[in-house]
A protein has these predicted regions:
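Short linear sequence motif anchored by a di-proline
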Residues: 1-202
Length: 202
């Protein structure tokens, strides 16, 4: 699974910075960053930190969003608080089946750029955190799903997201050995070539 991450300004601004639009980057720093919890050296999803995501509707300019997807059909704050601890991650194998993710999997995809993520190794009844990052330390692009939820009690709007996970590879199988989970998991990491394809599947 993926519940703990590190996210710096530089990582979160990767896609906008690549476009070379300095005015846009400045606008993000001035008008969006203050509404996030960045920079994050160790964020736990269960604390529902606020990050930047790049959505299929705005692929080059980020959106402020809270970790823990809240589907559009959630009726009130009580239901919202119950569901978003269960939607921090979305199993890639079932995103088109689960009611919480079906709509987003078809229409609302996003990318989250991070410096790395933490996974815990279990040994002798203790857990040991491992920090996973790229060898070149460049930002990691994670596949995500997002949703806009309108609070019917206040009419307030909130963007939320979930990180898509997949079966752990050989390396992650050695690290992510939680006995309570069936098989190792890891976030779905996108290559540069896969980013646009993820946002706009055919």
């Amino acid at each position: 699974m993926c519940y703990d991450i590190k996210a710096s300004y530089e990582a979160q601004l990767k896609r906008a910075s690549q476009k070379g639009d300095l005015a846009a980057v400045e606008e993000i720093l001035d008008n969006l960053i203050p509404f996030t919890d960045l920079p994050i050296h160790h964020a736990c999803g269960f604390c529902h930190p606020v990050l930047l995501i790049y959505t299929n509707e705005s692929p080059d300019f980020p959106t402020v969003a809270t970790w823990g997807l809240v589907p559009h059909w959630v009726k009130d704050e009580e239901q919202q608080k119950k569901i978003w601890n269960n939607t921090l991650n979305a199993r890639g194998e079932t995103i088109f089946e689960k009611p919480s993710f079906r709509q987003a999997a078809k229409n609302n995809r996003c990318i989250i750029y991070i410096d790395g993520f933490y996974e815990h190794h279990h040994f002798n009844k203790k857990t040991y955190p491992f920090f996973i990052q790229r060898k070149d330390k460049n930002p990691i692009a994670l596949a995500g799903l997002w949703s806009e939820w309108i609070n019917p009690e206040t009419n307030g709007r909130m963007n939320t997201f979930s990180i898509v996970t997949t079966e752990g590879n050989f390396l992650m199988a050695k690290i992510h050995n939680n006995p309570k989970i069936k098989g190792p998991r890891m976030p779905l990491i996108l290559s540069d070539e896969q980013e646009d394809e993820w946002l706009n599947p055919t």
